[in-house]
Amino acid sequence: MKLIYLGAEVGSNRGLLEGMGIKTMGISYSRIVKRGEPKTKLWLVSERFEDDALVVASPGISETDGMTVGELEDFAKAYREFIFNNESRLSGVIEFAPPALGPEWTVAQRELYADLDERFWPVWNPDFGFRNLVDLTNDYQEIAVPGAEVLSNTAHQISGHMRSATARNGTLFHGLGVSSPESLIQTPLATASTLSWTQGMRNGETIVWDGTRLVRYPARMKDQARPRYKSVIEQAGLDYDAILADDNKEVTRLAIWSYQQLEKDMDKKKPGNHPFTVIEGGGDVTNSDDFEMELSGNTDVDVTNRRSSVERLGNPPPEPRKA
């Protein structure tokens, strides 16, 4: 399984990730816009990321209520221009398909991204039914599925369709907004994106891999939690004293290192195991709103010739589009 570390549009975040050897990162177009970037020049992945970085772009808009049709269309146009300006350096592009603009608009927009081939990931709308999901698997190698559906009462049906499509066409699936570790294991999704690695510097959480699972402690428990993992922290090559002193950068490095261990461990897990725990006053919570799934799916079916576009990022980037 491959984790996609979100928030890499922020330079300081990107620096921490690169310093820990992270290569697979996610950027949000809406967050770039909200940060007021760029002001006088194009925002280019090639100028901000290392050459071997694996970058996935998403619209970054989860709630479109309140936006008019015109505002949605304007955002879609701006997002499309952003993607084409960065096309040669993107591994994956998550579709912007607000239901308010309707299925005909969505289909027409997909044609505009045809040159991206497997790097364009259409989003299945459950309102269109399973027949539509099957149709998408016949047309696209990689498909995004809303996380709410992965966790719904029909999750077993969706999972069945996913497995069938993977066996039939080598289709890879991308779960959007899945927060349940159980779903990470039981659903045929192979990569997940998360912003949770920033919780230490944002909210004072302690995120640590204890050797068998990822454990998250709220800020109020950091003084009692961090000393428990002194040997783990030191063996990871991190500065225990800095973490004890609540140094934001070192606490964040601990979180990144811990997610790296989770990523390795998830490949070994089978349904029923829980490699992720949030400690809230001593209780285990197996769901976390901060753990987001946005990316692709894989199963034990041999799809050697149908590699995810994230995996392909290690190859030379495609030639830039001709004007």
Label each region the model flagged.
Residues 148-149, 179-213, 277-290, 320:
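Glycine-rich phosphate-binding active-site loops on the catalytic face of alpha/beta enzymes
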Residues 58-59, 68, 72-201:
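Eukaryote-skewed repeat-based solenoidal scaffolds used as protein-protein interaction platforms
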Residues 210-250:
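A conserved mid-domain beta-alpha-beta active-site/ligand-binding segment of alpha/beta enzyme cores
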Residues 1-109, 114, 208, 238-246, ...:
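Non-catalytic, usually N-terminal nucleic-acid engagement modules in DNA/RNA processing proteins
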